[in-house]
Amino acid sequence: MEMLQGLLLWMLLSVGGVWASRGPLRPLCRPINATLAAEKEACPICITFTTSICAGYCPSMVRVMPAALPPIPQPVCTYRELRFASIRLPGCPPGVDPMVSFPVALSCHCGPCRLKTTDCGGPRDHPLACAPQASSSSKDPPSQPLTSTSTPTPGASNRSSHPLPIKTS
């Protein structure tokens, strides 16, 4: 009887684990809409805009005996295809380019995280929104539509796939 109970418990845990990993609580890697912030040091106004980024769950594994074997690379949700769009920052002084370009996700996939070009999580060195200013020049974030786009770039899986502010100097 004890062996039958152990077998039943093992089956329930096995099926429950498979069901939980495929449930609606973990949406798979896909393009989603996100609001980002853009600013330039010389321009007085920070704006927010909506674009599509790659986000979602990528299946991963962890070794049971990590000391015996090297770590398994963990996949991240990243761009498969993208295009670039641009926005114009209002109020920039003469001689300062008011255009800021950013990637727009067309399709996503689970792939390796390339630290050189991708935000792989962890602490951020800049905020995800417009910073409040103490001076009278406001950096309140008015919403801005996209102004121009370029052609899709297939196979560009090494672009940043998480919402980051676009800040240029």
From Swiss-Prot:
InterPro entries: Cystine-knot_cytokine, Glyco_hormone_CN, Gonadotropin_bsu, Gonadotropin_bsu_CS
Disulfide pattern: 29-77, 43-92, 46-130, 54-108, 58-110, 113-120
SUPFAM superfamilies: Cystine-knot cytokines (SSF57501)
Keywords: Disulfide bond, Glycoprotein, Hormone, Secreted, Signal
One Pfam assignment: Cys_knot
Residue positions with a glycan: 33, 158
Biased composition (Low complexity): 145-154
Signal peptide per UniProt: 1-20
A GO CC annotation given for this chain: extracellular space
Bias (Polar residues) ranges: 155-169
UniProt GO BP: G protein-coupled receptor signaling pathway
Secreted found in the keyword field: yes
Subcellular location(s) per record: Secreted
Segments for region (Disordered): 131-169
Keyword Disulfide bond part of the UniProt annotation: yes
One Gene Ontology molecular-function label: hormone activity
Family designation: Belongs to the glycoprotein hormones subunit beta family.
Record function comment: Promotes spermatogenesis and ovulation by stimulating the testes and ovaries to synthesize steroids.
Subunit composition and interactions: Heterodimer of a common alpha chain and a unique beta chain which confers biological specificity to thyrotropin, lutropin, follitropin and gonadotropin.
Name of the molecule in the record: Lutropin/choriogonadotropin subunit beta
Originating species: Equus quagga burchellii (Burchell's zebra)
Gene giving rise to this polypeptide: LHB
